[in-house]
Amino acid sequence: MHSTASSTPHESRATSPLFNWLAVITLVYLILVAVGAVSHGFKGFSGGAEGAAQIFAFANNPFVALLLGILATALVQSSSTVTSVIVGLVAGGLPMGMAIPMVMGANLGTTITNTIVSLGHIRDRGEFRRAFAAATVHDFFNLLAVFIFLPLELMFGLLQKSAEGIAGLLLGSADLSMKGMDFMKPLISPSLDLIDGAVAFLPGKGASIATIVIGILLILFCVTALGKVLQRVMVGRAKELLHKALGRGPLTGIASGTLVTVMVQSSSTTTSLMIPLAGGGVFNTRQLYPFTLGANIGTTITALLAATAISGAGAQLALTIALVHVLFNLFAVVLIYGVPFLRELPIRAAETLARVGSENKLLALGYVGGLFFALPALMMVAVK
């Protein structure tokens, strides 16, 4: 009797709504810190923007440029940084015909972050299957977009001509810059500084590698814990409200994904936070699909607003590249999601890969390493 009575207060605290929601907030914050740590570590290891520029020096045709865009973004962990590098390279004489495939590659490379987050569910086959499918639907949508629009661009210059026309109209309009409006950085910077301080004693690239490892381990822990807590809190009214915000319909999902991504200025963050919801069974891949597409659009709008504030000789080029990114994602959403047959392809591919990957975890890990690192790196070596 005594042991039962003494355990009751602990159980009531652990199951109280307030405790659970505080746990959700804490774990979401730690996931943001973990994703930031992985990104920070990769930037330090690869040399950041300078490293990305060195990678692009190997581009000698559009297909290699595409793969190098994937590799650079996977290493730097920031499509915004890579796109900024591309703008600088174009201003320095890089042909637009090379720059546009690089932007497409950056668009694909940024999807690695939520795929890494899905690996946090790898110990539970059912959770991992749901989480991996929700993450890789982003990969397959962007792959399909590249397969459709890269040939069209090479043959007709669809994106470049459209972007140049719109850039000419927008140039000289009022500044709409969002530079400096990074809402996430002030929140996670203190924690990242603590991690930096803890690994600062390591020599050379050791600190960057340690930061990546800490980030990945933190992701694995937090995603597992968050999945369990979400199963307790996502019931009743809370679940109903979230479904209204994200799962009411395709347009609502796309709008929500766009808005949230513009606010946090990171599609990686937006989509990564949805993965535990998928792993916990709160949403399925089909329901999160439109939200993911909205995140694709949202990250390009941020870059566009920043580009409109650039003046001088690089203004036209900056706007053109930013608009290429916007139009690429807008056209892809309209065409792929608008055509029922095409709409289903990313979902089917993601669910098939997740089913196979949940049965063979090494295959899932090989997919991540192969698509984002090994294949582009091999191509870079081949053309060296």
Briefly describe each language-model feature range:
Residues 4, 109-118, 235-260, 264, ...:
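Hydrophobic alpha-helical transmembrane segments of integral membrane proteins
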Residues 21, 29-33, 116-186, 217-224, ...:
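Juxtamembrane and boundary regions of transmembrane helices in multi-pass small-molecule transporters
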Residues 24, 28, 57, 69, ...:
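Alpha-helical transmembrane segments of multi-pass membrane proteins, especially transporters
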Residues 43-130, 134-144:
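Early transmembrane hairpin of solute transport permeases
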Residues 114-126, 229-233, 275-281:
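C-terminal ends of transmembrane helices
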